[in-house]
Amino acid sequence: MAIYTCVLLDIDNTLLDFDAAERQALTDMLAEYELPHDEHACAVYHQVNRELWDALAKGQMNKQKLFQVRFGRFMQAMQLPDNGKGKAMNDRYEELLSTHADLLPGALTALEELSEVATLAIVSNGAAAVQAHRIAASGIDRYMDGIYISEKIGAAKPSAKLFEHALRDLGITNRSRVLMVGDDLLADIKGGINAGVDTCWYNPRNVENKTDIAPKFTVGSYEELYRIVMEPEELENLGVRNRRHSNEALL
């Protein structure tokens, strides 16, 4: 039996390449509105967006407000006149974002291996419609025992409520065997800590942790994650077990 029998997973930049999706959707949308869409514009948007999502994680803003003000703040930061189309720009950006579901290298193999030994579930703060489309398009849904999006649940990471809903729905009672894996310290790791489960910071870029948030584990690859989740005998059987989802993959 695995060391961790339930693994909760973030989506963006943990399983799917959100940075690439964000950049493409953003530049396409800005081009449609005949606005600057160069590297500088992308960097400004990323900073504005990061600040807003951090405010959401701290309980200072809800998601509806975030989506309403995001591109108005961007226009202001770019020193561009407010065109009054911030909400329409956001809607178009989200629509374009939903069409991008690029997997990070090795993600499907990792899910295939982990799903052999543990209950897997997604816990995400993304927009429900966008994430649902990206999850289905990427094929990661077939490995999941549950998918929990904050917009549907009514609570966002790092609130323990989202995690508690997921664990209750999954029938998980022993939190000592639960591991939360994600790339965002404030949302994923702090959220897991708030929920009383062990945490693993997925940090393939070796970003410095400048916060006081302390994950139990830090990994730079899925292979390192295997060694945290699996018992030694399970590690020896990587790639050779009967596939729990093999028939589904052929449908």
Enumerate the predicted regions with their spans.
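Structured helix-beta-strand junction loops
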Residues: 48, 116-117, 143
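N-terminal helical cap/lid subdomain that shapes the substrate entry/recognition surface
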Residues: 2-105
